[in-house]
Amino acid sequence: MATKFPKFSQDLAQDPTTRRIWYGIATAHDFETHDGMTEENLYQKIFASHFGHLAIIFLWTSGTLFHVAWQGNFEQWIKDPLNVRPIAHAIWDPHFGQGAIDAFTQAGASNPVNIAYSGVYHWFYTIGMTTNADLYQGAVFLLILSSLFLFAGWLHLQPKFRPSLAWFKDAESRLNHHLAGLFGVSSLAWTGHLVHVAIPESRGVHVGWDNFLSVKPHPAGLMPFFTGNWGVYAQNPDTAGHVFGTSQGAGTAILTFLGGFHPQTESLWLTDIAHHHLAIAVLFIIAGHMYRTKFGIGHSIKEILNAHQPPSGKLGAGHKGLYDTVNNSLHFQLGLALASLGVITSLVAQHMYSLPSYAFIAKDYTTQAALYTHHQYIAGFLMVGAFAHGAIFFVRDYDPEANKDNVLYRMLEHKEALISHLSWVSLFLGFHTLGLYVHNDVVVAFGTPEKQILIEPVFAQFVQAASGKALYGFDVLLSNADSIASNASAAYLPGWLDAINSGSNSLFLNIGPGDFLVHHAIALGLHTTTLILVKGALDARGSKLMPDKKDFGYSFPCDGPGRGGTCDISAWDAFYLAMFWMLNTLGWLTFYWHWKHLGIWQGNVAQFNENSTYLMGWFRDYLWANSAQLINGYNPYGVNNLSVWAWMFLFGHLVWATGFMFLISWRGYWQELIETIVWAHERTPLANIVRWKDKPVALSIVQARLVGLAHFTVGYVLTYAAFLIASTSGKFG
């Protein structure tokens, strides 16, 4: 007899109901719980899957390069990046009538195409690609790399090539290799690419496989490097009149500290970027030689952590026991990795628009909006995931004895203080921010807008002034030419001050009362999300109601007071609730960013400044006013090139609303409905010929919440993505 799904759990495979299928899918990646799983096998499986993951990333990027080269207009775009719209790929759709074919035949193409809003054209151009042949070569290279990684993944699952558990637990060696190899050497290699290929290409000098060994990146060659005269590499930078991609106004410097932006491309100077990556390479290569391996030299992390005990004794055992706790818990490691990656992804969103590094991307407004929103959403998901795995760590991996009186133990001991302070901050922010918005709404509605409570963000303006912004007249630090800070920063300051005080970029935007209010609304969202996540993680293992939940697991439902009241203590439910708050916060954040920038890009900053201080302003002048083109994507008179976004806007709402069907209903209702349908099916001629082996049962509470949340999330993202892209591209192309 064929074994039933899931093969990894005999217990589930023998379940006579449809629960078998859903629980099988839900636990497919929970390797720890699979039958016969050993710790060594667990590590080996996860290790091998990393190669598969990387293979997919390389394949995906290869596909992007290939489609741009095959169906895009890269070579035409390079000639006029500010006016030619980049093509992502062609569209072949049997549903298209003549109207749609005409509407989507755009950007100089002879057939329907999609416009690229990912910024890849700007990236390809900045790093030295100038022809379709370059793109094809990149695609083939990544395809080969992808195959190699797939093979490596398979190879590391073979008995002969499976690393041992001891190899996985050797944290110091792994850290050295990852610091020096992954970050250090790859940053050095990227510096090499920028210096040898990208910078010459930006100056009109072609460097390819045919001549890369004979073209010197700098006229002085390696002599200054070996003689210690490194300053030569910073002399004669590109001038302010440099035309990107040509020798006009080009210099010879390769590693500079100019500060600010290239006047024509409005992106960071490539020579500054190369210098930055070289500095990172040096730092990380040194860092990768710090830790003790089998050679017995260097620091032992375990010794360092165990020695971290405050001499006063007031903070207990300090970091004692943490090395083994972290090293033996994959969930702890994953939580740390997700938190770090979440923060860095949010920083990427922030810096991609404020300090754009790719040529001409600052003037591709739809791409800027899409990239900011994309990276902030990803950051949100990663951060929630960090806390989810932190909670699973407490349930599955935390050993109170091994962590007696250390910082982890003490965090749990005073968790009430942490949770209550977060609660207080959330309540304070919520009531005061909403109070101000609602007050302003009421007085505007009654025709007395002058009675609004408008608060200038003076502290934030002071911080901007300290960084060099002259507008507010604070005359402090970098905005004061005679200050210590200004004298110390003389090398890069002229370029930086030009950039920060220019009205044409997004670096340190002018802020007022509308920004003050929405900043606090976003702070409310962040603190409430954090409150739910921190409480969920700290109460995951035990709370007043259930002192130790180790055997109860992570994903049990919050079931209300009727069945024992587990809402206080379900870590899964905290994660579930936090997802809604995270999405809510991202809504406020991206609305703010987009509306503020629409005003700047259209030369009408007053629209945001005057209407963002009360709620109706947000609903009417941001959401409603900007969805006009979207709702008109197709109408009785025909179709335009926003129709796909108009359709997605509708479809996104539908998916989002479907989520509530799963979220606001009783499980018993579904069970009755299912049994009624089964009863009718079994008594209907012809239909009753078809039978199934599993007895249909309603989804469990946790499953229904997950399905509801998935619909809510996907619908929410689809709806806003369509709105963002259509409302921006409808105005600026």
UniProtKB/Swiss-Prot annotation:
The chain crosses the membrane at residues 46-69, 135-158, 175-199, 273-291, 330-353, 369-395, 417-439, 516-534, 574-595, 642-664, 706-726. SUPFAM superfamilies: Photosystem I subunits PsaA/PsaB. Belongs to the PsaA/PsaB family. GO terms for biological process: photosynthesis. PsaA and PsaB bind P700, the primary electron donor of photosystem I (PSI), as well as the electron acceptors A0, A1 and FX. PSI is a plastocyanin/cytochrome c6-ferredoxin oxidoreductase, converting photonic excitation into a charge separation, which transfers an electron from the donor P700 chlorophyll pair to the spectroscopically characterized acceptors A0, A1, FX, FA and FB in turn. Oxidized P700 is reduced on the lumenal side of the thylakoid membrane by plastocyanin or cytochrome c6. It catalyses: reduced [plastocyanin] + hnu + oxidized [2Fe-2S]-[ferredoxin] = oxidized [plastocyanin] + reduced [2Fe-2S]-[ferredoxin]. One of its GO terms (cellular component) is photosystem I. The lineage of its organism: Bacteria, Bacillati, Cyanobacteriota, Cyanophyceae, Oscillatoriophycideae. This is Photosystem I P700 chlorophyll a apoprotein A2. Chlorophyll a B1 binds at H653. Gene3D superfamilies: Photosystem I PsaA/PsaB (1.20.1130.10). [4Fe-4S] cluster binds at C558, C567. Its EC number is 1.97.1.12.
